[in-house]
Structures are given as structure tokens and as C-alpha cells.
Amino acid sequence: MTWHILGAGSLGSLWAARLGRAGLPVRLILRDRQRLRRYQQAGGLSLVEDGQASLYPIAAETPDGGQPIQRLLLACKAYDAEEAASSVAHRLAGNAELLLLQNGLGSQQAVAARLPRSRCLFASSTEGAFRDGDFRVVFAGRGHTWLGDPRDTNAPAWLTQLSQAGIPHSWSDDILERLWRKLALNCAINPLTVLHDCRNGGLRQHPEEIAALCDELGQLLHASGYDAAARSLLEDVRAVIDATAANYSSMHQDVTRGRRTEIGYLLGYACQHGQRLGLPLPRLGTLLARLQAHLRQRGLPDR
């Protein structure tokens, strides 16, 4: 069965290259004919590992391609996910499966609601990759991907193909708890790196601010029924800051480069969820307002 991959960014390209070199059938879906022509001129996807580049001539097409889609990896940004999924909805088989590889929360639920006949699996990944040019991606850090389905805990048989492709993964019966934990870590770190214009390690100068945010995030996780995700949150945030002290957060990099952030699916989603629960989150709300004002000042979308 063919893997269709929509989203030729860093993680989508990384998955496509590894699945393709394992001999599995893969097709990239590119947004329009102009993008397809540029891909064909490049000759395929380039994957750089340990300083060595390899070219993988993965087949590619546009969303209006004719072949039915049985399995789709959606690897675009959270704010593009629903529209991207809709662009190929007419091609989805009746029992199609979608693997949603988005940051934060909210986009996955929107896609699942838009495509009720399809099985939507959520994913949370710690793998590191970045684009080094058009259709060229650098594998920057080995990590792990957890996959799960909030509505069905039965793992699909095709997970063996991920092992065949050398993609470290685990099936998770509590994927939402994992995604909430990752969201909380992001909310405690990334917005502050933007507002203080610092590397992750610079947040060591703001321990009270970090502690106050973790306290509210812990309240939100407990109120949402994710007690395990709230456990040792502050300690883990400090550990992430120490382990990545020399790095700029992904949100800081987006803002610096004038790119839209995924704020609406991270800090924005946390604040909206608190409102739905009737849970006051004054520190998180203030942080969101400060970050939105900062983004508007730079001419960037604030949601």
C-alpha cells in the first residue's frame, strides 16, 4: 500500500526519504504544478545524514492526482493542516488512515472532524530535522515518534513498515496525554524566548516567571484529566532548558525569520481550553497577550 505524504517540509521529507529507501511505495503530494516542476528539476529529495547527502527520486504529484489515497501522512504546519487535508479529501478511500504529524493541539481535532470517515492517528515526535534548501533536509537529531488514536487503541499492522524504514516509534494508548505534556513544555519555554529575545539557556535568568507558568500549566493539565502529564513539569522544563541551553527555540527562529508561528495551537490553545473549563489562567493569558502584541508589532499573524 502506498504512503502518500502531504507536506514536503523537514519531517515530511525525512519520513519520505526513509520510507522510500526501505523500498516502500511513497508518493509526495506537492501543492501545485509549479512546485511539482521545481521538484522534478531537483531530481528528488536530498537527505543529509552525518554530513553526507543522498538523493531519493521519490514520485510526486499534485493534490488533483488520480490515485485513491489509503494512507496519508500529513506533515504540514498546524495552521495549514485542515485546508491541506481538505485538498485531497476527494481522493481518500472509504477506510483511509491519516497520520497527523502536527505540533500542539487543535489542528488534529479539526482534521478529524472534517474527515469523519477516515481514521486519524495523532503523532508526537522528538526527531530533529531542518530544511537546508528546496527539497533538501538535514537529519539533525535522532529521536522517537509516538503514535496513537484517541478513539481506538488498536495499533495498525503497518507500524512494521516504520521499523523496516528505521523510524523509531512506539504505539501509545495515551497519545493525548503525550501531546499535552509536549504542549505544556512548549508553553513554558518558547514564548519567553521570543519576548526576552534569548536562547533557551537565557531563561535561567527568569526562574520565577518559569515557575509561575508551570504552576498554571499544571493546574490546566490536572483539570483536563492528565495528571501524569503534570507530574514534575517544572523539573522537566528546567532540564530541557539546560539540555538545549545553546539553542534558539523554534518559535524564536520563526519570529526572527519573519515566519508565522503556531501560537494558536500551543499557548493559544492552552488558554482557550482553560476558558472552556472555566479555569482562570491569568499568567498564561497575560503571556499570550504580550506575545500577540509582539507578533503584531513585527507584522506577523497573532493566532
Curated annotation (Swiss-Prot):
NADP(+) binds at G7, A8, G9, S10, L11, G12, R35, N103, A129, R131, E262. Its EC number is 1.1.1.169. Its main location: cytoplasm. It is an enzyme of class 1 (oxidoreductase). Pathway: Cofactor biosynthesis; (R)-pantothenate biosynthesis; (R)-pantoate from 3-methyl-2-oxobutanoate: step 2/2. Keywords: Cytoplasm, NADP, Oxidoreductase, Pantothenate biosynthesis. It catalyses: (R)-pantoate + NADP(+) = 2-dehydropantoate + NADPH + H(+). It is found in: Cytoplasm. GO terms for cellular component: cytoplasm. Disulfide bonds: none annotated. Substrate binds at N103, N186, N190, N200, S250. The keyword Transcription regulation does not apply. Pfam families: ApbA, ApbA_C. Catalyzes the NADPH-dependent reduction of ketopantoate into pantoic acid. This is 2-dehydropantoate 2-reductase. The gene is panE.
